[in-house]
């Protein structure tokens, strides 16, 4: 999901920044587009899953499934899953809606981040300031990855940190930072040869990370996945720069 989050952050933030600069961005229209894009397919799939599960699941399992789907509609399923089911638990393989936690994280991110961008741009009128603010947010949220897992478990009652929004937002912010950087007027321009080398190296390093990281490695999203996110961003950046040329 980390690669998906980077791509999502890059694409959606790119659209937001373009519309903000053109004075055509509307939070209402943005949220309306998101709802129209996500909910029809989501509701259809969840209805089908619920119908099938009602026939083959025992009551307790179906009740958990129902709660997950209900909270997913409000973009809160990641918190419920954090309380009830670890991503790498054996029982997770039997949960047909396990992966919708990512929609919850995305929903929360795009509920907050566009508002930060539009308010900051109205005040400062500079994309450079948006980049700095986003970078500060990135480091603040990344720092929460260093908080003890016991704190999340004992204080926040979230034993499964895999799903936590504050540990996943940095992955989306990597993509957002790249999108904002592409809109800077004084960004660094690399030669096509350098871009090609960086693209190849980033691809190799990304696959190395994916190969080396497995279920046996202690998982802390912000720390464990930040390198794959950076390599993904480098691949997007170098290939997009070559396409522009």
Swiss-Prot record:
This is Uncharacterized protein HI_0392. It comes from Haemophilus influenzae (strain ATCC 51907 / DSM 11121 / KW20 / Rd). One of its GO terms (molecular function) is acyltransferase activity, transferring groups other than amino-acyl groups. Its main location: membrane. The chain crosses the membrane at residues 38-58, 68-88, 100-120, 129-149, 194-214, 217-237. InterPro entries: Acyl_transf_3_dom (IPR002656), Acyltransferase_3 (IPR050879). One of its GO terms (cellular component) is plasma membrane. Belongs to the acyltransferase 3 family. It is a multi-pass membrane protein.
């Amino acid at each position: 999901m980390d690669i998906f989050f980077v791509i999502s952050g890059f694409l959606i933030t790119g659209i937001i920044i373009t519309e903000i600069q053109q004075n055509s961005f509307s939070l209402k229209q943005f949220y309306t587009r998101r709802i129209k894009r996500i909910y029809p397919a989501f509701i259809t799939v969840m209805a089908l899953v619920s119908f099938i599960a009602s026939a083959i699941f025992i009551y307790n399992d179906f009740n958990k499934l129902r709660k997950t789907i209900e909270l997913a509609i409000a973009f809160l399923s990641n918190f419920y899953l954090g309380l009830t089911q670890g991503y790498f638990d054996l029982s997770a393989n039997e949960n047909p809606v396990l992966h919708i936690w990512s929609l919850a994280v995305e929903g929360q991110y795009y509920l907050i981040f566009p508002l930060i961008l539009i308010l900051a741009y109205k005040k400062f009128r500079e994309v450079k300031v948006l980049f700095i603010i986003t970078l500060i947010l990135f480091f603040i949220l990344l720092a929460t990855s260093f908080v003890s897992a016991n704190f999340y478990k004992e204080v926040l009652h979230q034993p499964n940190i895999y799903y936590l929004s504050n540990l996943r937002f940095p992955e989306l912010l990597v993509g957002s930072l790249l999108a904002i950087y592409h809109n800077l007027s004084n960004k660094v321009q690399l030669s096509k040869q350098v871009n090609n080398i960086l693209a190849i190296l980033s691809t190799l390093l990304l696959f190395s990370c994916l190969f080396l990281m497995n279920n046996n490695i202690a998982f802390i999203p912000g720390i464990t996945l930040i390198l794959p996110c950076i390599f993904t961003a480098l691949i997007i950046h170098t290939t997009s720069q070559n396409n522009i040329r």
